[in-house]
């Protein structure tokens, strides 16, 4: 089924391209077959793990599957279509009723297996496991106070306005350097809350945890963070975003990680997802 699905998509989009050969000498048809094989293995591993961990469908899950079946019937053979007509439609696409049920059941079980292994938010991942994941992928955590050099529409400020922003940044840096080192972290947090113009502060109030050196942040910011030790504060760092004063932090399992989603997740959860993906 998976092979047919891929083949149907490719031929509809690009015509008969299955014999096209990649640079390593493998035809597109062979690549599609390998992808299909991978999906088959993945689905059966999930099924085995569900059985091994006693993960079963709930009544709510079954209700979701029943709704999915009805929706698929209506979208495939019409609002007045029957299950029999729907299964005839599937048969033309190399799908048996058993395969249809199996695939949909696995889709519903997938997140339940994750929760059984790691907890809903990765809480079963230990601190040591989360920090080992951070070390393996070079995660770093940093806060910054940003003075933007563009307006809300993205238009660059004038040279005079930029100079004023830099002077403001210098005044804040001087204030930080004027207090004993033991007091700087607390003062940094106060000044970040009062002075920073970073729109991401509301989502990441305790700093950004990200994969250092991977292009997640602008290079000037990233280079500055990687040059600091935890607890150290940078000088004024200029980037396309503006002027930054950066403080590197110790990485903790509860740091919010930048995963390219609108929803922030903890490092602990990110470690769980990475481990889960490596298995499945």
Task: Show where each model-derived region lies.
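Short amphipathic alpha-helical segments that mediate assembly, nucleic-acid/protein binding
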Residues: 83-86, 130, 169, 184
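Surface-exposed intrinsically disordered loops and tails
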Residues: 10-11, 15-20, 213-219, 226
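Second-shell loop/turn segments in exported
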Residues: 23-37, 46-56, 71, 95-100, ...
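Surface-exposed patches in mature extracellular/periplasmic domains of secreted proteins
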Residues: 52-62, 183-194, 234-237
């Amino acid at each position: 089924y998976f092979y047919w699905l891929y083949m149907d998509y490719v031929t509809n989009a690009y015509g008969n391209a299955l014999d096209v050969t990649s640079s390593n000498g493998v035809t597109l048809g062979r690549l599609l077959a390998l992808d299909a094989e991978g999906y088959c293995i993945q689905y059966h591993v999930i099924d085995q793990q569900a059985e091994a961990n006693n993960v079963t469908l709930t009544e709510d899950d079954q209700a979701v599957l029943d709704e999915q079946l009805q929706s698929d019937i209506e979208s495939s053979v019409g609002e007045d279509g029957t299950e029999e007509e729907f299964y005839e439609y599937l048969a033309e696409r190399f799908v048996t009723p058993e395969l249809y049920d199996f695939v949909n059941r696995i889709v519903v079980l997938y997140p339940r297996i994750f929760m059984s292994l790691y907890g809903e938010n990765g809480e079963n991942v230990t601190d040591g496991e989360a920090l080992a994941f951070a070390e393996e992928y070079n995660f770093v955590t940093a806060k910054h106070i940003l003075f933007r050099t563009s307006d809300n529409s993205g238009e660059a400020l004038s040279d005079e306005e930029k100079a004023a922003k830099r002077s403001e940044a210098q005044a804040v840096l001087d204030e930080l350097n004027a207090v004993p080192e033991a007091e700087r972290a607390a003062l940094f947090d106060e000044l970040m809350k009062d002075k920073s113009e970073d729109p991401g502060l509301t989502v990441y109030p305790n700093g950004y945890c990200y994969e250092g050196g991977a292009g997640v942040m602008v290079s000037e910011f990233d280079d500055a963070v990687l040059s600091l030790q935890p607890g150290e504060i940078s000088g004024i760092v200029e980037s396309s975003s503006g002027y930054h004063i950066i403080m590197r932090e110790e990485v903790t399992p509860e740091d919010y990680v930048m995963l390219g989603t609108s929803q922030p997740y903890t490092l602990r959860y990110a470690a769980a997802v990475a481990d889960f993906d490596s298995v499945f």
